[in-house]
Amino acid sequence: MTGDTEKEQEPSSGEQQLNVLKRIHEILTKHSSTQTEFIPLLYHSLKQISKHPNNSSNSLDAATSSIRHRLKTAKTLLQQDPAAIELVSKTPEQWQLHIQEKKIELEKKTKHLQRLRESIQKQ
């Protein structure tokens, strides 16, 4: 019984992948006054640099440090879980095809299981 409760507490590999992807999503999409979206921040930084190129506080490196930090954190998380890399490497079209294949496979397994149940009930 102790082994069963330990298994229930450990997340499955699918849950671990989902947790990694959730953490990456949170890192890359945080919205607050200090962490804005990537594109507007880059646009603003480039505009400021073009307006005042000699101002030392208008460095692209300084302006984009938060973006680089968030991307490095996401990259580290991805490197820790090869399955997560596979998940994010497919295009939406590839995922649609993959989902269709899995649905067909599941239907076949369901039909096979139903036939097995029927044959067991006959005995």
Curated annotation (Swiss-Prot):
Single GO biological process annotation from the record: regulation of transcription by RNA polymerase II
Keywords: Activator, Coiled coil, Nucleus, Transcription, Transcription regulation
Pfam families: Med9
GO molecular function term, any single one: transcription coregulator activity
InterPro entries: Med9
Cellular component GO terms, alphabetical: mediator complex
Principal subcellular localization: nucleus
Coiled coil segments of this chain: 95-123
Location in the cell: Nucleus
SS bond list: none
Stated role: Component of the Mediator complex, a coactivator involved in the regulated transcription of nearly all RNA polymerase II-dependent genes. Mediator functions as a bridge to convey information from gene-specific regulatory proteins to the basal RNA polymerase II transcription machinery. Mediator is recruited to promoters by direct interactions with regulatory proteins and serves as a scaffold for the assembly of a functional preinitiation complex with RNA polymerase II and the general transcription factors.
Assembly with partners or alone: Component of the Mediator complex.
Annotated protein name in UniProt: Mediator of RNA polymerase II transcription subunit 9
Lineage of the organism: Eukaryota, Fungi, Dikarya, Ascomycota, Saccharomycotina
